[in-house]
A protein has these predicted regions:
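Cell-wall glycan-active module
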Residues: 13-397
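Sec-dependent bacterial lipoprotein signal peptides
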Residues: 1-11
């Protein structure tokens, strides 16, 4: 029952496992003195033409050690997990890529694998009371439920009082779901914790990522729980940040995408062009369609309706417009007929090139956030850290 009380208010919270080594390249077969007369073995594919593993790893470690902030705990462990993620994702260990990851980790967790959330216990209790009143649950019934011993030996009340991290909250929720009466019936398949780990990556993204690309570690637990480990949080966070073809002139826009969703900076610029052509004021949030729980929802968005007003000038009908808008979360959108014709009209109207990138205008909302923050604030703050990191790197000749 307690799981119900926590479910609504803790979603969208924004802020270590042991590394199991994985070779970044295939080792050559051993030399045989008298090989049998067999056909030559088929060469195994290599992910990219990188230097030999030992030199590549040594150079990457040297560079990363120089770029990491001075005073972080378990420097060797962070180095191992960051380089392992790059290798698994086949992303080169360049200063730009390393510093992008470093900047996000520093912003989201200050290099703490399971970062504390200020006031998490207070937030939990406030939501428990709100839900108790909403569902008319007698206070005595709730108090009795919270006195029940949980699997770790403490009562649920004691665990809520001691909450400090999202990983603890996630484990508490799992225990309540399986142990408290009615938990599975009421809340099976739902968990209020939606982000986690040192890069505060979306659990939904991690679950999708593992469907697209094999996870590089031996996994003994759920994808959700892997996000809360250092190795998993770094891997999924770096995938979210770097493992897609962002059409941007600066890393700044990837930082905005990390916060708002992939291609949000590209799409916000597209919305601005639509707004200027149609004369309609639009929220430049990077979402061209309406979404619910991460999937397109019924009903037209404001952006969609504004584009429909331009359909004669675009020489596209509503079905064709919707077809192309459904590509908005992929690189294919910028090659669509809608995208090309819309920008051609916008540039003909203004007499000047229109930007293809823009920081989304989104207010950040979470029980953890106690002041007004935006996606633009996040992106610029991370970009400052990114540039500071680059300044610690080697000077080009």
């Amino acid at each position: 029952m307690l799981a119900c009380l926590l479910a609504a208010g803790l979603g969208g919270c924004a802020t270590d496992g042991q590394y199991e080594p994985r070779s970044p390249a295939v080792s050559p077969p051993p030399v045989r003195a008298t090989p049998p007369p067999t056909a030559p073995p088929t060469a195994l594919p290599r992910p990219s033409p990188v230097p030999p593993a030992s030199a590549y790893e040594r150079d990457g470690r040297t560079l990363l050690n120089r770029l990491l902030p001075a005073n972080i705990g378990d420097r060797a462990g962070w180095t191992t997990d960051i380089l392992a993620a790059l290798t698994a994702l086949q992303i080169p260990a360049l200063p730009e890529n390393l510093c992008a990851a470093i900047a996000v980790i520093e912003q989201e967790s200050s290099f703490v694998a399971d970062p504390p959330v200020a006031g998490l216990s207070r937030i939990a209790w406030q939501e428990i009371e709100r839900r108790r009143e909403k569902y008319s649950i007698p206070k005595l019934v709730l108090d009795l439920a919270l006195r029940k011993a949980s699997p770790d030996g403490r009562t649920y009340r004691a665990r809520i009082d001691a909450l400090q991290t999202e990983r603890q909250m996630n484990a508490l929720y799992d225990d309540m779901l399986s142990e408290l009466p009615g938990g599975k019936t009421l809340f099976g398949g739902y968990n209020p914790i939606r982000t986690g780990g040192p890069m505060q990556v979306s659990i939904a993204f991690a679950e999708e990522q593992i469907r697209q690309r094999p996870y590089p570690y031996v996994r003994r637990d759920s994808v959700r729980n892997e996000v809360f480990t250092r190795r998993g949080g770094v891997y999924f966070g770096m995938a979210m940040l770097l493992d897609y073809p962002g059409p941007y002139s600066q890393m700044l826009y990837r930082f905005a995408d990390f916060n708002a969703g992939r291609y949000s900076s590209r799409n916000a610029a597209f919305q601005d062009a639509v707004s200027r052509l149609s004369g309609r004021t639009l929220a430049l949030d990077g979402d061209l369609l309406r979404y619910q729980d991460g999937v397109p929802a019924d009903g037209s968005s404001e952006t969609q309706r504004a584009i429909f007003l331009l359909r004669a000038r675009l020489r596209l009908n509503e079905a064709e417009i919707l077809r192309d808008l459904k590509l908005e979360k992929s690189p294919a959108f910028e090659h669509s007929v809608l995208y090309q014709r819309l920008y051609a009209l916008a540039e003909a109207s203004s007499g000047a090139p229109r930007p293809r990138e823009r920081l989304p205008q989104i207010d950040l909302k979470s029980p953890k956030i106690t002041r007004q923050l935006t996606t633009e604030w996040f992106a610029r703050r991370v970009d400052e850290r990114y540039r500071t990191c680059l300044a610690r790197g080697p000077v080009e000749a």
